[in-house]
């Protein structure tokens, strides 16, 4: 019914309930019934409404709430006044969002260049990543100082930027990039998922691929080796859904058809 609910720790107002008290069971955030999509970072939340507006709340140390300041908010506050937001993905301390015109925007922590601006400056308001209008599916991930973005374009190409540690950007190196860089030359990518120290993606043929840190066997290659270029997980072609969350550190998950 498009209502929004939250529970758990609330020291920075990340539950959006107007206070900082812990909740041990689900509590409705306001009374609205027009919430469409939700993403959460570390102690903050950001959500899209059916009218195309974007709202954020919780911790705001790096400006990740997009308010032009670093003040924390314990109730949802609108990000600007636009009604053209279409998708949103939260990393640990930053946000990546897409508009209906196919542009992508970022703000918050930028220690590893994850804002895609060609620098490592933090931004407390949305800034456009390049000038392209052909971005399709977005994902954001990474930890405290190693944020990453993974995005598929409408032409099926895959692009990544941010921290390159463990080869997590898929460029056959461990270099960090502060602007989008294409992963290989393929045009068959469909669904991305940026984790904490690794990435996953599904191709249009239903195969599942991964790269980055292999610690704990999270790349499903039968070992704990790091891979700096995409490697296929098994031989199946029936993978369909990746997690909407992008904060996974030690585990990989996917759903088959």
PLM regions and their residue ranges:
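Short loop/turn segments immediately following the C-termini of beta-strands
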Residues: 9-11, 43, 50, 59-61, ...
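Short coil/turn segments at the loop-to-beta-strand junctions that recur within blades
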Residues: 21, 32-35, 71, 82-85, ...
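Short glycine/serine- and acidic-residue-enriched loop/turn motifs that recur at repeat junctions
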Residues: 5-24, 57-74, 107-124, 161-178, ...
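Blade-level signature of beta-propeller repeat domains, shared across WD40, Kelch, NHL, RCC1
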Residues: 226, 241-257
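Conserved core positions of repeat-based scaffolds
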Residues: 6, 44-47, 56, 75, ...
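Tandem repeat domain/solenoid detector
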Residues: 1, 34-37, 50-53, 84-87, ...
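Surface loop/turn motifs at the tips and blade-to-blade linkers of beta-strand repeat domains
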Residues: 29-30, 79-80, 129-130, 183-184, ...
């Amino acid at each position: 019914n498009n209502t929004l609910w939250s529970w758990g720790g609330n020291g920075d107002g990340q539950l959006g309930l107007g206070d900082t008290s812990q909740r041990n069971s689900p509590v409705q955030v306001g009374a609205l019934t027009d919430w469409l999509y939700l993403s959460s970072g570390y102690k903050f939340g950001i959500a899209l409404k059916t009218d195309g507006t974007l709202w954020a709340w919780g911790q705001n140390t790096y400006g990740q709430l997009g308010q032009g300041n670093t003040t924390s908010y314990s109730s949802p506050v609108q990000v600007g006044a636009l009604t053209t937001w279409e998708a949103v993905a939260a990393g640990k301390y930053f946000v990546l969002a897409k508009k209906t015109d196919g542009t992508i925007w970022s703000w918050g922590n930028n220690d590893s260049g994850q804002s895609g601006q060609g620098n490592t400056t933090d931004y407390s308001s949305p800034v456009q990543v390049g000038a392209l209008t052909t971005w399709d599916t977005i994902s954001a991930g990474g930890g405290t100082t190693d944020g990453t973005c993974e995005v598929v374009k409408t032409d099926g190409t895959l692009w990544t930027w941010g921290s390159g540690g463990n080869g997590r950007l898929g460029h056959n190196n461990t270099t960090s990039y502060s602007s989008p860089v294409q992963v290989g030359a393929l045009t068959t990518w469909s669904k991305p998922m940026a984790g904490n120290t690794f990435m996953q993606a599904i191709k249009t043929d239903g195969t599942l691929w991964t790269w980055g840190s292999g610690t704990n066997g999270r790349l499903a290659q039968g070992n704990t080796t790091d891979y700096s270029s995409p490697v296929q997980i098994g031989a199946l072609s029936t993978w369909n859904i990746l997690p909407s969350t992008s904060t996974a550190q030690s585990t990989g998950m996917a759903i088959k058809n």
